[in-house]
């Protein structure tokens, strides 16, 4: 960066002291130096050139001594940057967006303080007697600061207030999902261009309708999503219900492990299942795990191999009678018996 001496024309040859250079800001890519510093620099340079033309060297040293104390400190540069930002036409929008974000979820006392900030700022400006330039059009002699304009029009101004609204966040999320679904998967440019033609132009009324539907049915959609995530697999009963059915099965295993209609209703109330689910569970359980045990001292009918008639044998019968009894169990009285693989109730 050029020094004051070089801008003043070099001064006298006898002047060996170099004037201090301006300290650049910490982030020059975001905010440019304030125009006030350029005005001071231009005034110092013109006075130095005027002194050099009249005094032939003596004025140069006087100008150097006059601007010796004009070195800009970091604190002064920061204050000048703040003043430039506060005087920008978009400063009110930036302040409103920032306060809108802070108000989301704030306690009542903090919300009251945040609401009073704009009014207090206006009173402070009126007391200082320096109205902001946002109320005045830019003059022709003002140096345009494009970097500051870009900073003021960044996401802090345009998206700050919208990010604080939960409904706006939902709309932005839906927009991103729609954009991702409309991305073309083809390899050629024609396929990508024709993959989602309706995404090129979106009617503003559609956006408004989508926003209204989201605000109205957003809670119901969240409940449905939660219900689908907790949905059990098809054909598999809950663990607690299965434990209760298994407990009933073990208690009635020796007699007849199949509930009646009244018992099904009781089990349905305790397990939260319907009677059809209970019936299917007991049918599968009985087919897979139930093996009826004969009662001691009971006689079983056996089938004679030759004549096909029935013959009663005692408990100490032969092996053929025992095999026939195991293949065709029959319980007399009110006990059930098996015929052709089907369970029947005795009379």
From Swiss-Prot:
Map out region (Disordered) in residue numbers: 1-36, 122-145, 179-206
Note the InterPro entries from the entry: ELK_dom, HD, Homeobox_CS, Homeodomain-like_sf, KN_HD, KNOX1, TALE_homeobox
Which stretches are tagged as biased composition: Pro residues?
Answer: 22-36
DNA-binding region, residue intervals = 229-293
Q: Which domain of life is it from?
A: Eukaryota
PROSITE patterns for the chain: ELK, HOMEOBOX_1, HOMEOBOX_2
Fetch the CDD domains from UniProt: homeodomain
Q: Give the ELK domain ranges.
A: 208-228
Give UniProt keywords alphabetically: DNA-binding, Homeobox, Nucleus
UniProt name for this protein: Homeobox protein knotted-1-like 9
Organism the protein comes from: Oryza sativa subsp. japonica
Taxonomy-wise, where does this protein's organism fall, top ranks first?
Answer: Eukaryota, Viridiplantae, Streptophyta, Embryophyta, Tracheophyta
